[in-house]
Amino acid sequence: MPTKIAVSTFQCMKKIPPGAPVWNQFNASFINRELDTRGIVDAIYSGHPVTTQHKNNWRSSENFICGQHLALDFDSEDNTSTIDYLSNDKFISKYGTFIHTTISHKPEAPRARVFFLLDEPIMQAKNYTLAAAALLWMFGTADRQCKDAARFFYGAPGCEFALLFGILPLEMVKRIIKDYLSSGANELKRTIKKNFTVPTSQEKVSSVAFHPSMGNQLR
């Protein structure tokens, strides 16, 4: 199944230092593609960073077109960040598409990334960010920086990888978001009740703010 993704023309053997002059060139280096799983893995294995699709030849949330992948970084540098451990997680083994060691991985300090390719693309930046945040919430040990709609992921030259070939349905993403927002609403209610006496009408407004109609929210 072709996936909408953007691949950089850069081949990064290591991370680009903050403030490096090359960042502008890098942000303009992503080309919108439609690739199958092996094509994406080949790009990552060759050291090419990937991100969501953008317009105007510039990677930014304002230029977001769509995203058809979600990814989680596991950087604990222990057994829980190994490919073997992650591939045995029930959710990952069912819905994960592939796992690879990251550019910062060391055998004595393992780091890995799980990619979930979606059956349909997410068409709005705010909804992509929400989906990424919800997945992070479900995996409390994942790197919290993975939720930006313009977030890119470095390739990892010569990385180890495991192909799982799972696909994460958009309907499942919506369910995860619903649970994520519900947990936030419940926490807000507990905080309000602990500190204030709030009129029923205001409490309902707060609840609604955390429970948008799912419908076509992700499209």
Predicted feature residues:
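Short, hydrophobic/amphipathic alpha-helical patches that form generic packing surfaces
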Residues: 47, 154-157, 219
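Generic recognition of stable, solvent-exposed alpha-helical segments in well-folded globular domains
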Residues: 126-130, 150, 213
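Helical (often loop-to-helix) elements that flank the catalytic cores of nucleotide-handling enzymes
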Residues: 81-89, 117-142, 163-180
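Long, charged low-complexity interaction segments
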Residues: 4, 98-101, 178-219
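Short, polar loop/linker segments at the starts of domains and inter-domain junctions
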Residues: 19-29, 164-172, 206
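Electropositive, intrinsically flexible nucleic-acid-contacting patches
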Residues: 4-14, 150-153, 158-159, 172
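Signature for HUH/AEP ssDNA processing cores
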Residues: 1-110, 117-130
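Short, conserved secondary-structure transition motifs
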Residues: 105-107, 116-117, 144-168
